[in-house]
Each structure stands twice: as structure tokens, then as C-alpha cells.
Design a protein with these regions (language model features):
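Short, well-structured N-terminal submotif of metal-dependent ribonuclease cores
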Residues: 1-42, 51-68, 161-167
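Short, amphipathic alpha-helical segments that act as regulatory/interfacial helices
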Residues: 48-52, 114
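Active-site neighborhoods of divalent-metal-dependent phosphate/nucleic-acid chemistry enzymes
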Residues: 78-126, 130
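Acidic, PIN/NYN-like endoribonuclease modules and their adjacent C-terminal/linker elements
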Residues: 115, 119-167
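A generic structural signal for short hydrophobic patches within well-formed alpha-helices
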Residues: 10, 44-47, 127-128
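Ser/Thr-centric signal marking residues that sit
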Residues: 7-8, 43, 112, 122
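Short glycine-/acidic-enriched loop or helix-start segments at secondary-structure transitions
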Residues: 14-15, 48-49, 130-132
Length: 167
């Protein structure tokens, strides 16, 4: 299965903890070689932005911590970078997602996952809930990737698909 890993799971690599999630979740996930793992090029931007904010405001992490974390992602042979410009459908779908979700980067990352992978690992269950309340988006996502799945939080629960809608 092709899995896109959302930005939150990479935060420990730049010394930012994730509440209620084991710090080893990414290491444990990547040890499962039966899947292919991807990240969005926007994840690198998001990690840098979050890291610089903490570095400049609280001095809890350093620019070197950010660089080390990004290098770890980019040099890990188990991870493949995907760009939001790799497929023209990504921007089209992101535009439709933007109608229900205000975070443009989230929209682009989710659209990238839907267009080029089988699953997204994310902590953003509210975005999934918003999509599930929008029949036109459910139809569009199914048109692009009929069996796309979402996997949430600590990955202890089963993958979730979009709800069925009557045609």
C-alpha cells in the first residue's frame, strides 16, 4: 500500500513532541516494509515554519535541530517525496477541499495523498469528518481514487474510508 505520512508525524524529528502519540510511532511505522511511504514536499516547508516559530519565540529548538530533522527525512531511503505539482488533479482537488477547510497546505497535502497514494496517515480527523459531510467531495475523491483510506492518530484503529452516499 502507498501511504502518505502527514506532517505531524515528522515533528519529533525536529524535537517537537506530539501530544498523546508515542515518540517512536514513525520509527515503528517505517519498520513495516510491506508498504511504500511518501511525504509531501510541503511537509518540509511546514516543518521548517513550525520549527522556526519555536526557535525564534521560545528558543526550545535550534535551526540546527530543524536542519537535522529535514535531512533525516530527505535521506531516509524508505521515504519518497511527492510534490503537489506532480499531478494536475492535485491542485484541482485542493481547490475543492479549500471550500470546506481553511488551511491551504492541509488541502494540498490531502489532495496529494488522494491523487498519488492509497492512504494518508493523519491526526486531522476533523478534516475527514468535513469531507464526509460533503457528498460532492466524496464523489470527486471516489472518482479519483475509489478505495482511498484514512488512518488516524496513533494508528491503533483500522483504516477508514469515506461514507457511502446514495447516487
Amino acid at each position: 500500500m502507498k501511504i502518505l505520512i502527514d506532517t505531524s508525524y515528522f515533528l519529533p524529528l525536529i524535537k517537537i513532541g506530539i501530544e498523546n502519540i508515542p515518540q517512536t510511532i514513525l520509527v515503528n511505522l517505517l519498520s513495516k516494509t510491506s508498504h511504500e511511504y511518501f511525504y509531501s514536499n510541503l511537509t518540509i516547508f511546514e516543518l521548517t515554519a513550525k520549527g522556526l516559530k519555536l526557535s525564534s519565540q521560545k528558543n526550545t529548538i535550534s535551526p540546527q535541530d530543524i536542519r537535522i530533522g529535514i535531512d533525516a527525512i530527505q535521506n531516509d531511503l524508505r521515504l519518497t517525496e511527492k510534490s503537489f505539482i506532480d499531478n494536475p488533479l492535485i491542485i484541482e482537488l485542493a481547490s475543492q477541499l479549500k471550500v470546506i477547510h481553511s488551511d491551504t497546505i492541509d488541502c494540498l497535502i490531502f489532495a496529494t495523498a488522494i491523487c498519488v497514494c492509497d492512504c494518508i496517515i493523519t491526526m486531522d480527523s476533523s478534516f475527514f469528518d468535513q469531507i464526509n459531510k460533503t457528498p460532492s467531495l466524496i464523489n470527486k475523491i471516489r472518482e479519483i481514487n475509489e478505495n482511498f483510506r484514512f488512518w488516524f492518530n496513533d494508528l491503533s484503529e483500522d483504516l477508514k474510508g469515506l461514507k457511502s452516499i446514495d447516487s
